[in-house]
Structures are given as structure tokens and as C-alpha cells.
Amino acid sequence: MAQLRIALAQTNPAVGDLAANAARIVEWTGRAAERGAHLTVFTEMSLTGYPVEDLVLRTSFVEASLAALEALATRLAEEGLGEMPVVVGYVDRANLAPRVGQPKGAPLDGAALIHRGQVVVRSAKHHLPNYGVFDEYRYFVRGDRLPIFRLHGVDVAIAVCEDLWQEGGPVAVAADAGAGLLVTPNASPYEREKDDVRLALVSRRARESGCAILYVNQVGGQDELVFDGDSLVVSASGELVARAAQFAEELLVVDLDLPEARFGGLGTFETEAGDGTVITVERVELSARPLEPYEPLTPTVAEHLEDTAEVYSALVLAVRDYVRKNGFQSVILGLSGGIDSALTATIASDAIGPERVHAVLMPSRYSSEHSLGDARELVERQGINSRLVPISGVVDAFEKEIELSGLAAENLQARVRGTILMGLSNQHGHLVLTTGNKSELAVGYSTLYGDSAGGFAPIKDVLKTLVWELSRWRNAQAGRSGEFLYGFARPPIPENSIEKEPSAELRPGQRDTDSLPEYDVLDPLLHDYVEKDMGSAELVAAGHDPALVARIIRLVDLAEYKRRQYPPGPKITPKNFGRDRRLPITNRWRETTL
């Protein structure tokens, strides 16, 4: 057996900021060298950020990526880090003639090995995901190479992200090609329970291939996606050896005992990949002789977050990175005293600090004194900025000019509030946070250009019952501080905001249950219809009331046009409103209850 010390660089790149991403790669490679690493592995497309979407269809962007890769190799050598082998992700291109159905320029989701100022080998993702949030058939052509480099007597293979999730391809070839270690750069977005699925997958692939696997995952928020890190090292027998933290950057350094190289030959050869394709295996040698034995480091296995803490951390990171990466210094939101705006304000305070959160209290003639009191109580507990802007006078002015009644009059109040928030955003440069939850978005219980107006929607993918669960969990953390918890001495959310019956307060005595069933009845139905794509017959067979099924399906289907105009927000479920669920607005198909 031979020893290797490997550094897994779980970083948070910014899409399109090639210079900053490259500087970070150099910085973290230096940190890995200080800790005695023999190899440093970065995440998928760590040089360009991920996902880059249609940027890869621009020749200028692909050329910039290729130039940045060469410049990075030179810079690492100039910084005295040339002896450190470094695996980085970037955008490459294939030498293919243009053809119909092929992405312009034939881009590749590439991974490269840099050593001694040179790009030694290049690889690219073979399996292109085209489901859920992924559209990689649109953006990339598949790679067909498996690089294996010999480092201190160990043969190390490189495969990218989805190649680990699918059968066949480079991972299937790695073991037969003699690899003792498989490194996989990843940009695998978060959703609930995915961490358990991910560990089970990596363990199974390790056992199948007979290779230890390094799974290096991106961390950070990128528009609707949140990347949770949670990088893994698994032995050839499938046992967890080391694990990085969730939702935080980390340099995870681990020592492994690995089998010495079995094959002597270098160069290239072709082999069947088990998925009907042929993979070209490319062997190169960096160093043939194993290292002298040394005292290994004790491996680190980060404490895993329980589900509620995991979801809350994802929401905080999403808000923090959306604000930071888009150049905002502060956020603004309407604070009603209800639970949705209370949770949104708390997430924002935890993300960027209460001093950068601005709340606007906008009571109408229908707002209760206790709601205004609850909003003021939250402001006091958290120390956020606030201002009071009563809306009755503005609403009255509208109604003098335009005669409105019923729902139109109710929605006018929400639209006045939205206009006030957008005006203050324009004046002061705040990012407007909308406060709607997934249950409301599903059934259209929101006002277009009113409470839906804004730039980012932190709880867009959070069902109402989970809003309450997250709020109670956050209050239970009072007195604690950390990466995702501002150190509030008292529970940051007033208890009355959690316990009172929800209401939009747009008419006298209004309650959500005037229009909707109880949320503990509604949310399971929405979960089954939206996230599990059950039809009406399946929903009834699952135990949902037939009349309610018919009513809720109709509401969900008719609200598609509203959701298309809603701001982006972080995905935390297997199917969010946005990238995951794509339905026509003009659509006459209706489910029927059988």
C-alpha cells in the first residue's frame, strides 16, 4: 500500500468571475501545501462557477475559460506551488464540426490536472444530466476520456459529477483500468435528504469499482440553487472516512492508504464503457515511487445537521450569497406581524446581519393592533431597521379615482405596499425580499405586482407547515451564534406571530381558512400533486378528499401565470416552482377526480 495526503477544496465560486475564482484556487492550493497535501482537488467548474447556463454558448466565454486555465497553471508555478498537482473544473470545447442539435461551439464540462506550470491532462463530463434543474444537453457535448495519473505510486482517475450517478462511462472503466483512487469534482445542488442519498451512492460506487472515492462538492448560493458542500471521502469498501461541513467552505485534508499501481504501461487505449460508448483511457506519470511512510492525520468527520437545521442553513446561505454576489448591501421587506414575513426577516438577519435589514410596517384600516404590535416586537428583538408607512391614505386616493370593490379592492392594498417597497428599493438600493411561501404560490394566494413584487423570495419553496416548524426551531436556538445564527439573546420571532391564525388582513375578520383548507390538510395534498406529480385518481387513492382534490388542482393549475412572474428563490425540495416544474401557462388540460 502507498500513502497519499489529499486536500478537498470545498469552495464557493462566483459564476463568471474567473479572476476571483482563479485567485481563490491559488490561495487554497497554498493552504493545502501548508498542510502537507500531495494533491489538491477543487469542485466542478471551480474556475468558471456553476451553472453557467447560456454563457457556454458564447465563444468569448469559452475562450476566456481556456485562457484562465493556462494562466492559472502559470501562476501556480510562479507562486511556488508548481509541485502540487491540482485538479480544477473549467469550460472546455470539443473539436467537433457544427451540426444540428449540438450546442454551439461544442462546449465541454471539463476537469484538468495542473502540475509544474502545465495542464497535464484534460477530461470532461461523460454523462450529461437532463432532468430536474439540469439542462446539460443544451449546453455541453459529452466527454469520452478517462485520465489516470500516477502520483507517488498510486493511479488516480478523474470523473466529473454525473459520471458517478449514472451506470457505465468513466467510473465503470476506472477499476479495470487499474485506478486505486477516483476523484470526482462536483456541483451537486441541495435538496432535502439528498445528503443521505449522496453518501449511499458514493459508498456503492466505491464498492463496485474497488476504488476509494473523493467526492468534492461546491458550496454556496447561485440564483435558485444552493450547493451544500458535504464533501466525502469513502474507502474502497464503502466506509465513510472523512466528511466536510455542510453549507460552509472547508479544506478537508485526509490521509489514505491506497493500492500501488498495478499496470506499468503509459499512453492511451480505448475500452468499452458499459453504456454503449467507448472511453479513451489516458495514462500519465507524475511520480512512480511511493512516499516513505509517515504519521497520518486523524480524519475529520463533520457533525451532520438534522433536517430542520439543514433547511434553515440552506435558506440563510441562499440569501447571503444572492445579496453578496449581486452587489447589494442591504435588503428591505414588508413586515406585517405574520409568520411569513417574520421568518423571512429572521433569515435575512442571520444571513447579512440585522443592521442591514430594513423592515417597512404598512398597516391599513384592516390591520389589527396585535399584528402591528407583533411586527414592532420583532423589530425590537432583532434590532433591525424599521419605518412606519400607513397605507390608508394612498389606498383612499386610488379609490377616489377608480371605483373598486371585493377582491380588486383587497388586492389594491397589496399593490400599494409593493409600490412602496419598490420605491424605497430604488431610492436606497435595497434588495426587496418577498415573503410568500410555497403553499400560497401553489394555489395563487398572492397578489400579482403586490406581495409578489421583489427581487428574491427566501421561502418560495417552503410549505406553510414547514414555515412554522422552521420558526419554532429558530426560536429554540436563541442565545446561540454561528455561521447561520446571529446571536440573538431572545427568541427572534414573537411567539404570537407563530401561534396566531394566519390572515392576509385585507378585509375585516379575514382568515386564510376563509379561502383555503387548514394547512396541515393542504400541504400534504400539494406535496403529492406538485412534488410527486400525482394525478387526481392517484391523489384520491392516496387518501385525499375527492372534492378537495378537484378544487386544489384547479387552483394550482390556474395560478401558473402568477408563478412565472414571481421572483427566484432557493430550491430546497425535489421539485420547486421554477427550474424543476415547467408547465404551459396557456393550458386546457385539467385533471378530473375519478
Task: Describe each PLM feature range.
Residues 1-334, 350, 361:
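Enzyme catalytic cores with a strong preference for nitrogen-chemistry domains
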